[in-house]
Amino acid sequence: MESSPDPGELIKSSQPSFFEFQKQASLMTSCNLLWKELSEHFTSMEQNLMKKSEALRQMIETLDNQTQSSIELLKHREVTIDHSVEIAEGKVEERVRAALDSLEKARDCGDEDTGEVDDGDGLLSALKSLCLKMDARGFWGFVIARKKELENLRSQIPVALVDCVDPPKLVLEAVSEVFPVDKRGGGEKVSNDFGWACVVILESLIPVMVDPVMGKSRLLVTPSVKEKAKEIAETWKASLEERGGIENVKTPDVHTFLQHLVTFGIVKKDDLALYRKLVVGSAWRKQMPKLAVSVGLGDQMPDMIEELIIRGQQLDAVHFTFEVGLVHLFPPVPLLKAYLRDAKKATALITDDSNNSGRSAHLVARKEQSALRAVLKCIEEYKLEEEFPPENLKKRLDQLEKTKTEKRKPAVIPANKRTRASYSGPMPPAKAGRITNAYVSSFPPPPPTFIRSQSHSPQYGVPAYTTSPPTIYSNRSPPYQYSPEAVHGSYQTSPVSYPTAYGTYCSPVAAPPPPVYHPHPHHHHHIQHAYY
């Protein structure tokens, strides 16, 4: 008979299988999770590769288009260069003939006086005459003498330079008086800054050198002129050390240098770092954003704007932002508000100056007004009224203007009456006793502040003379002095005499008895003349 299996043995043999099943199930779960992660990772990589591939394809396509357009442009420039040169030569011949005719007329009629110009036509005629003669020194003197006619000069100089035989040569010779190195004397150099004239003349030269076929994309500058312009630029850069470095260069000089580079097309990529420092140091100039782009700093504009913001020049940063179209990266309204906050902090520091409170208040008002006007002008220029309503700023500006006007009004000061040193009553005019018609007072005379000399005292045996009260002597002063002792009687102490100039010659009212004063003997003479 077969024995039945032991249940305990069955249980022992089944336990390893159950644990193994759990282990395999856990392993399958881990494999599923890993597969899912790997699938997502490779899918993401595939998508990124596809995006990058598409971006590269677009870049290659863009470069191909740019290359093709550049090749076509070069072909067009090559084809048109001969025609442009022919046109330029024809213009030069016409200018030469016009210059010769002008010189002949000048010899026949005498030199015209270009010093006095009444209107725009006269200004243009004078400029044309100087350009035809290639009179660089006269041209320079004519321009610098008319700074008040700056707008007319901007519009008329390019027209006049068209008639010049060699406009670049005339311009370089004209500005050579102060650029690249100022050749004037010390006194004139300090008093007059002619950087504005250099900039106007250099700007006016650009439309004259524009290619008649290609337009502004190509300037007709001869190799000799370009080499001369490069030498001038190198001379200016070499003079920076003598001026104390970039930080000490004047803004008009920086503006002239950058405009010189743009006008003659002599920008160097190796000097971009120098150009950036110069632009940031003179960023408040209105033309600086355009010049920065023209000298090849367009790619560095975001970093330059960040630098301006860090330096506290938010207003300049706004101008740069709009010039290069980076408004989406640097919103203008927060920058303008930050500029106003910084201005308010600066005024608070000035207010803390307790040494000169009046001057501090004036500086605070002026600085705040300047900041408000600059922000209002920026809002108007870039049409930011919806984002930054200017009403509150205008109200604040009007309030400051009103306060400034009220402070300028003269204060009403009451007239002070002249009084004696030892008496609170009114004092008669200083010249009352010196004129023929003596002043007649309706008040009793104040008491004197001095004692009669001891030599006139009765205790030394000299009796006090008596006299009747004075009579009216019409318009004349009494011919003699009288003693007030006759009116008031004798005193127990030394009597007091009254000054002649302030006696009651024409007053019937007797003066009250004055108190006795005993000043120091050395003060006798000083006090006696105190009223005169």
UniProtKB/Swiss-Prot annotation:
| Repeat is among the record's keywords | no
Quick one: signal sequence residues? none
Keywords (alphabetical) are: Developmental protein, Differentiation, Flowering
Tissue-level expression reads: Expressed in leaves, shoot apex, flowers and during seed development.
Please indicate if the UniProt record lists Coiled coil as a keyword. no
Q: Provide one Gene Ontology biological process annotation.
A: flower development
Q: Which domain of life is it from?
A: Eukaryota
Pfam families to which the protein is assigned, alphabetical: Frigida
Q: Which family does it belong to?
A: Belongs to the Frigida family.
Q: What is this protein called?
A: FRIGIDA-like protein 4b
Which organism encodes this protein?
A: Arabidopsis thaliana (Mouse-ear cress)
- What lineage is this protein's organism placed in? Eukaryota, Viridiplantae, Streptophyta, Embryophyta, Tracheophyta
